[in-house]
Amino acid sequence: MSGVGGESVHLRRSSTTATTTGSSKSSLNISKSVSPTGNKAVSPMSSPNSLQSGATPTIAQLQSLLKQQQQPNHSITTNNNNNKSVSVEIDDLKSQLQHSNINDTFNEDEEIEEVTDEVIINHDYHSSEDEYEDDEDEDENNNSVNNNSNNNSNNNNNNNTSISSAHSCESIAEEEELTASPILSRQYSYTIGHGTKPDVVLSIGGGFHSSPRSNRSESTIVHEDDLTNQNDKVINAKDKISSDYKRMMEDPEAFRNEKLKQRKSKFFTKKDLEEIPFNPSSGTQLRSTLFQQFMNEKIQMISENPEKYKSELMKFYKQNLKPQVPKSPQSSGSLSTHSDKLKTSSSLQRSRSVSQPPVVTGNSKNAIGSLDTILEKERKRDGNQDRQLPILFTKCVDFLSNDEALKTEGLFRVAGNSSEVEDLMKSILLYGSDIPSNCCYHVVSNMLKKFLRQLSTPVFTFKYHNDFIQTMKLNNDEERIKAIKEILKLIPPVNQLLIKELMKFLVKVTSFSNVNMMHAHNLGLMFGPNMLKAPSDSEMNAISMLDAGNQVITLLIENYNLFYDN
């Protein structure tokens, strides 16, 4: 019977199953069945006064009335405490039954089951559900019960009323399972393989075994990836790092030796390390060659004339070990002159652009001599009187004339290693050494610029410095070319030949300007300040001198055929 909280009450007896639910109308559904032994149930006595219109009769009263309805006299006798009997006619009974809304139809398809005397309250049953589904094993028992009830209904006459139940109950085991486990809402979309516990178990062979559909959600996405393997790799890497760190903190020296041993044995065996030849860098080769030549020269001098070498060595020590006393200014005039020179040099350094190379004047302490002096020394040393250009210049031009060097981006602009430039320059000037084949192109190009910059007399000479500046003030290039031609005829022959060969080489460099990014103007910026210099710092205008030198070199490169048409 139905309670206030929407609960369903199932009354179970040995021969009858009744279920009532609360609704706007009081209704009663009774399913009559035959007991397993085939005997009819005994009806207890009930009071007819309780069967009034609108009242709900009890099951015992209704069974008693139906029992007496089947008797021949068609009357029902009720005994009370005062032993009074009341005879109720069958018509009155039918009218009372109609007012009680009793369904007197028997549905053969309804399921009738035999249960014990037990009342089960199902809190999880909802009125919106039509009925519970029965198991297959319960269907067999219900079929046997229905057959017995059909046989019983055939024996009875038309007055036999079959009462059915609209809601049949399930087995006790099923109801206990429903009441014990609450209804849990499942996740609609379940993604496997991204940090959640999957419903699909991945197998080793690459396939997967799905769990039952009831245990999964409506939409399950299976990602067959190797996240497990990746997580294992990460964990292993973390463990290795932590173990290495621990060993490093415990014994740093042993850890270092172990890593060095692994590094050496990773690529080469011990035998390979012994057989691999040593390939020093170009700078190392230059230093070793220079030192070897120096030692050979000293050994030769000692063997030829030991006394002379000893006297020269003592003279050298006396000069360098002699203390130098700073000279004090003799007068205020000399002091003012010295201060003016300092101001001029400082103003020049401030006005000089960072991107432009520094200007080295003829008073530089690093001067290596003029072209004539260098060429004369080389002729005596090598015994070649036909040499017309310094060997350093010819070696640099020959080394940079191949296509690979000419395609080097930033040639003459990118700086090279200063120590390698210095060592290579000394080796060539003193001993005429060759340039190593693996030498950097930027080292050689910077050495050529440094050679031109450290000449005691610049290539365009101090004497004609102002003349070159004045030619660049002319109106057009034709006049400038004509004036420069006349000036070039006045400078020494060695300088003329060097300018011609250098401009010829720079024209070749500009032919690869789309690769090396060195146009005529860029080359003018690199060589102008090194070849056109003022006689002294006090007599030069830095801006005009730099612009004039750049313009002269650019004009020579762009109009090489006009200058040297022969």
UniProtKB/Swiss-Prot annotation:
<feature type="region of interest" description="Disordered">
    <location>
        <begin position="128"/>
        <end position="168"/>
    </location>
</feature>
<keyword id="KW-0343">GTPase activation</keyword>
<feature type="region of interest" description="Disordered">
    <location>
        <begin position="65"/>
        <end position="84"/>
    </location>
</feature>
<feature type="compositionally biased region" description="Low complexity">
    <location>
        <begin position="345"/>
        <end position="356"/>
    </location>
</feature>
<dbReference type="InterPro" id="IPR008936">
    <property type="entry name" value="Rho_GTPase_activation_prot"/>
</dbReference>
<feature type="region of interest" description="Disordered">
    <location>
        <begin position="322"/>
        <end position="366"/>
    </location>
</feature>
<dbReference type="GO" id="GO:0005096">
    <property type="term" value="F:GTPase activator activity"/>
</dbReference>
<feature type="site" description="Arginine finger; crucial for GTP hydrolysis by stabilizing the transition state">
    <location>
        <position position="413"/>
    </location>
</feature>
<dbReference type="GO" id="GO:0007264">
    <property type="term" value="P:small GTPase-mediated signal transduction"/>
</dbReference>
<dbReference type="GO" id="GO:0005886">
    <property type="term" value="C:plasma membrane"/>
</dbReference>
<feature type="compositionally biased region" description="Polar residues">
    <location>
        <begin position="327"/>
        <end position="337"/>
    </location>
</feature>
<dbReference type="GO" id="GO:0030587">
    <property type="term" value="P:sorocarp development"/>
</dbReference>
<feature type="region of interest" description="Disordered">
    <location>
        <begin position="1"/>
        <end position="56"/>
    </location>
</feature>
<dbReference type="GO" id="GO:0005737">
    <property type="term" value="C:cytoplasm"/>
</dbReference>
<feature type="compositionally biased region" description="Low complexity">
    <location>
        <begin position="142"/>
        <end position="160"/>
    </location>
</feature>
<dbReference type="GO" id="GO:0043327">
    <property type="term" value="P:chemotaxis to cAMP"/>
</dbReference>
<feature type="compositionally biased region" description="Polar residues">
    <location>
        <begin position="36"/>
        <end position="56"/>
    </location>
</feature>
<dbReference type="InterPro" id="IPR000198">
    <property type="entry name" value="RhoGAP_dom"/>
</dbReference>
<feature type="compositionally biased region" description="Low complexity">
    <location>
        <begin position="65"/>
        <end position="83"/>
    </location>
</feature>
<comment type="function">
    <text>Rho GTPase-activating protein involved in the signal transduction pathway.</text>
</comment>
<protein>
    <recommendedName>
        <fullName>Rho GTPase-activating protein gacH</fullName>
    </recommendedName>
</protein>
<dbReference type="Pfam" id="PF00620">
    <property type="entry name" value="RhoGAP"/>
</dbReference>
<feature type="compositionally biased region" description="Acidic residues">
    <location>
        <begin position="130"/>
        <end position="141"/>
    </location>
</feature>
<dbReference type="InterPro" id="IPR050729">
    <property type="entry name" value="Rho-GAP"/>
</dbReference>
<feature type="compositionally biased region" description="Low complexity">
    <location>
        <begin position="14"/>
        <end position="35"/>
    </location>
</feature>
<keyword id="KW-0963">Cytoplasm</keyword>
<feature type="domain" description="Rho-GAP">
    <location>
        <begin position="369"/>
        <end position="564"/>
    </location>
</feature>
